[in-house]
Amino acid sequence: VDGFRFDLAATLARQFQEVDKLSAFFDIVEQDPIISRVKLIAEPWDLGSGGYQVGGFPSSWSEWNGRYRDTVRDFWRSQPSTLPEFASRLMGSSDLYQVNGRRPVASVNFITAHDGFTMNDLVSYNEKHNEANGEGNRDGESNNRSWNCGVEGPTNIPDVNDLRQRQMRNMFATLLFSQGIPMICGGDEVARTQQGNNNAYCQDNEI
């Protein structure tokens, strides 16, 4: 083990309910002779007020770059006004990290993760399909920035399947050529699907 990834890491910085970038937790980490020398990766947000802290962690940390994910998804589904921000994400997101002198390695670039759509589902579904979770399709994120390429779900239409394959190649190429640390969700490289389920933590099956 050469590092740790902290889920909902903004919670660790909360003191008196507010996110404090100078919190005691960060001081303890910086002073520890072992932990201060390993890779530290933050999911830099939580569910509380002011919890979205992308770009706000100390220089020794790398962060999941949620802005990268959203911008790349929007760009490849041809959303307007994304080109300038897409260029920033491609070049290491200096607008987020240069304030305190951080380099592109501060940015963990990703398009998909264990939460949400797989890459295949991102180009195959406009809407989540979480009915199998037993919550009336109310669970999971509704704004997925996805595009089904013209047909919802699996199809035998060659042009649609070709477009989906091209879209996945576009996103993979963007991820691998961007400055920063690329993160690929396991299974995306073989077009794994969760059949449109973007909250499949409770599915102990092929999904």
At which residue positions do the language-model features occur?
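Active-site groove signature of glycoside hydrolases
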Residues: V1-Q15
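Short, glycine/acidic-enriched loop or turn micro-motifs at the edges of active sites
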Residues: A10, D46, R192
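Short glycine/threonine-rich loop-to-helix capping motif typified by GTGT followed
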Residues: R14-K21, Q195-N199
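Conserved alpha/beta catalytic core and glycan-binding cleft of carbohydrate-active enzymes
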Residues: K21, F25-G186, Y201-Q203
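Short acidic/histidine-rich active-site segments
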Residues: C185-V190, Q194
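Short, intrinsically disordered, charge-balanced linker/junction segments flanking boundaries
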Residues: N205-I207
